[in-house]
């Protein structure tokens, strides 16, 4: 009597769609591209729903709207390939925003301690100056737009302003980044529309 063979465990979903896309390019088939698009949509939905779950119901509507918009862009960047300049730029904005939030909270704590204490210590005063200097130096490091490259159409500057991370990018790379950014935007809009339809039926 033959022994029963244990079936192999199922292959887990690939969180990096670029790996699937590279395999599809090697096989030369369109099915791999469909798998890559499906994996990207799954990762997009995962990151977006996880970000939405962190929003409190007691948050004001205006702040909640701003948080949802930021969650949409953040989930797009996390689901995209890390080789894309626009995804790295969006994630950099998320990290910078988080750093500014932590700095503001630290400044509030320092001010509370200064008000509570009759005589503020020199270390606390230095902390306040360091935070203020950091914010000023970050604003002073704003990079001016690069000069227009020879032979490129006038719409290139508009694309550089619209696509995150497009500043200083040559025109051929800018077109590639724009196409990938628009694909991610379309997937994000479809996801949000699906969520609206789902909750409207309930």
Curated annotation (Swiss-Prot):
<keyword id="KW-0805">Transcription regulation</keyword>
<protein>
    <recommendedName>
        <fullName>Transcription factor IBH1</fullName>
    </recommendedName>
</protein>
<feature type="compositionally biased region" description="Pro residues">
    <location>
        <begin position="1"/>
        <end position="16"/>
    </location>
</feature>
<dbReference type="GO" id="GO:0009741">
    <property type="term" value="P:response to brassinosteroid"/>
</dbReference>
<dbReference type="GO" id="GO:0006355">
    <property type="term" value="P:regulation of DNA-templated transcription"/>
</dbReference>
<comment type="similarity">
    <text>Belongs to the bHLH protein family.</text>
</comment>
<keyword id="KW-0804">Transcription</keyword>
<keyword id="KW-0341">Growth regulation</keyword>
<keyword id="KW-1070">Brassinosteroid signaling pathway</keyword>
<feature type="region of interest" description="Disordered">
    <location>
        <begin position="1"/>
        <end position="33"/>
    </location>
</feature>
<feature type="domain" description="bHLH">
    <location>
        <begin position="136"/>
        <end position="185"/>
    </location>
</feature>
<comment type="function">
    <text>Atypical and probable non DNA-binding bHLH transcription factor that acts as a negative regulator of cell elongation and plant development. Binds the transcription factor ILI1 and forms a heterodimer of antagonistic bHLH transcription factors that function downstream of BZR1 to mediate brassinosteroid regulation of cell elongation and lamina inclination.</text>
</comment>
<comment type="subunit">
    <text>Interacts with ILI1. Binds to ILI5/BUL1 and BC1. Interacts with BCL1 and BCL2.</text>
</comment>
<dbReference type="GO" id="GO:0009742">
    <property type="term" value="P:brassinosteroid mediated signaling pathway"/>
</dbReference>
<dbReference type="InterPro" id="IPR044660">
    <property type="entry name" value="IBH1-like"/>
</dbReference>
<dbReference type="GO" id="GO:0009826">
    <property type="term" value="P:unidimensional cell growth"/>
</dbReference>
